[in-house]
């Protein structure tokens, strides 16, 4: 049997750099059980350098090999890479574009699918095109007085809004607006995080999540899990990743009827297939009190920390993450 050299790439230098390192540790623990892979941990720094765990700066070349600063070390040929980078430049599709150019196989969604899902405005256009209901919204391209007036009008109609940087992940640059007078400041603040902003109607609803992934030639959608925030508050970046988070998670959402479960899974599969995702994603929904289903967002590289939902839902569905990972990699490298 062939053994393959695999780069586990993490970090990225963005707002989710440290979370990426935690997720990479989960990948590393799984890869340690798979004898067919030699794994090299690389951290992509904010300066754009590749750094080994020992702190050595290396180069990942267009020839798909690692070159070390110590020229006495032979180049290390790379067969495959796992870009475990949340946010920029991983989930944005940027680094996948480079891998495509140098023909380096990688784990996760492709560059276009990643970009389409990461930008909240583009994603909503796709959801609507696929016939998947989503939250009412408007988008802004500048923090002008006219734009702020449009948000105030939406606030008057909807009662409350979320103001979100259109191209950030994990609730970064997202602000709930409960008072009209807060809107100008929050709009300007959101524009500090991205060149476009999306404003959504606040939905009072349960937050359900579905793990969708490729497994042995089939696309699997789990039964929805649920996040219950403390005091029904906004699921912030801190609530998502702090080990002291007060949010409660259910690997399978309680008290959801089978018809609704089936509809949610159908929408999740429709989004995964229609947007040409691959390998894995976490697809998040709102479920309102009157049983209305709204697709909230798609995470093309979901967190894999000790409190993350994706690996828990996969295991609850009866699949082992290491086995899932191995078959995904070998399917690409060996055409299985």
From Swiss-Prot:
InterPro entries: ATP-grasp, ATP_grasp_subdomain_1, D-Ala_lig_Van_CS, D_ala_D_ala, Dala_Dala_lig_C, Dala_Dala_lig_N, PreATP-grasp_dom_sf
UniProt keyword Metal-binding, yes or no: yes
Residues involved in Mg(2+) 1 binding: 284, 297
Binding-site residues, ATP: 154-209
Pathway where this protein functions: Cell wall biogenesis; peptidoglycan biosynthesis
Catalyzed chemical reaction(s): 2 D-alanine + ATP = D-alanyl-D-alanine + ADP + phosphate + H(+)
GO biological process: cell wall organization; peptidoglycan biosynthetic process; regulation of cell shape
Domain ATP-grasp: 124-330
Gene3D superfamilies, alphabetized: 3.40.50.20, ATP-grasp fold, A domain (3.30.1490.20), ATP-grasp fold, B domain (3.30.470.20)
Keywords recorded for this protein, A-Z: ATP-binding, Cell shape, Cell wall biogenesis/degradation, Cytoplasm, Ligase, Magnesium, Manganese, Metal-binding, Nucleotide-binding, Peptidoglycan synthesis
Top-rank lineage group of the source organism: Bacteria
Cellular compartments annotated: Cytoplasm
Obligatory cofactor(s): Mg(2+); Mn(2+)
Annotated GO MF terms: ATP binding; D-alanine-D-alanine ligase activity; metal ion binding
Residues annotated as binding Mg(2+) 2: 297, 299
Key word Manganese present: yes
UniProt remark on cofactor binding: Binds 2 magnesium or manganese ions per subunit.
Family (UniProt): Belongs to the D-alanine--D-alanine ligase family.
Function statement: Cell wall formation.
Protein name (Swiss-Prot/TrEMBL): D-alanine--D-alanine ligase
Organism, as annotated: Shewanella amazonensis (strain ATCC BAA-1098 / SB2B)
Name of the coding gene: ddl
